[in-house]
């Protein structure tokens, strides 16, 4: 959404280099950095051209260099460039819910214009230090494995690692559903440089699972902002900021708790790297932009808790060639409060959500924050699962009978814990037929303490699979014994 105030400040294109253009303006009328420019004119076929660009550099000699937010096909030297006098601004508020937008805040779902309302510029300062909520607070998700072993921080940033088909999208949708029902919050999804098909699938799955109400979009729980792989690097570089700006409105004006999903944070860095060389910057390590730390920091520092509300961010992280020392993921890790790692092995066993209880981490899992009961239970669960992992080779070669009585008990409890970490999801009801369960943190701790204490050693392990709290497991166990 780029409003042209008055066509008073008009320049001319002097050079087009792929997605980057140079434009010359009258003396004393140079646009500011980050101002939106609108290229107007007709291409060689006589068709109207309307391309929005963002000023990145002032070159001297009354020239600026700008990055295009859409294809520069058809642009030629001498075309008019209008300075809009302001940065790219996007619609915000409840009118954005249930809709799909591009980087400029224009709806791309063929459902007509967004109801007229407020707009915010995508470049905004991070909240002031005095406005921040510095007391660490756990963000309860209702998902047992996350709340117990990798608790999320309210206003924190979590990296979501996982390959294709292990359930990233389903976990995202469940979190969106739970924050809407339990916290009265909303979500914003930023699709940064991912496949168009995935964006389309996500939208359709959200309609199926009632996260989006196609008939009454205002009753939806999420706004979607897409800048896919086929978009120019300028759009992929800025679409994350568009999504973040929409989330900031819900936090600062509506005073809500917001979930911001960014899929994929690596593509944001990659787009910046593509543009950097065209802007004439000297590349740094592995060919990345020299401003890598600043680019990531500018985005991440705006994602935080204030005294009014919070933005909790879940960011899918692609690790190039599985190299965690690559500058892009390494820079991202510095900002994360926790990591949720999805395991293909668990998914193959049918244990969903397939969160790896030993690989996933959280800075919140400290006795001073979550309390000693939660901390001790989580650590005991992890040590039991770790011991089970160590014993698996012996079991595979010699069988269970060769284990000591104590180890056999550990294996038995670990298998129950593994199954109890699974849970039926609300958004998967239409596929599984099992009603979804939201499990409070207190019930989660109570359940795992009972398993660890040996109170449920007599129940079959199948009783713990895909249930909510421990009472449900007991009831299922009693039914299995009867049957």
UniProtKB/Swiss-Prot annotation:
Keywords: ATP synthesis, ATP-binding, CF(1), Hydrogen ion transport, Ion transport, Membrane, Nucleotide-binding, Thylakoid, Translocase, Transport. Pfam families: ATP-synt_ab, ATP-synt_ab_N, ATP-synt_VA_C. CDD domains: ATP-synt_F1_beta_C (cd18110), ATP-synt_F1_beta_N (cd18115), F1-ATPase_beta_CD (cd01133). It comes from the Bacteria. It is an enzyme of class 7 (translocase). GO terms for cellular component: plasma membrane; plasma membrane-derived thylakoid membrane; proton-transporting ATP synthase complex. It is a peripheral membrane protein. It is found in: Cellular thylakoid membrane. Its EC number is 7.1.2.2. F-type ATPases have 2 components, CF(1) - the catalytic core - and CF(0) - the membrane proton channel. CF(1) has five subunits: alpha(3), beta(3), gamma(1), delta(1), epsilon(1). CF(0) has four main subunits: a(1), b(1), b'(1) and c(9-12). PANTHER family: ATP SYNTHASE, ATP SYNTHASE SUBUNIT BETA, MITOCHONDRIAL. This is ATP synthase subunit beta. The gene is atpD.
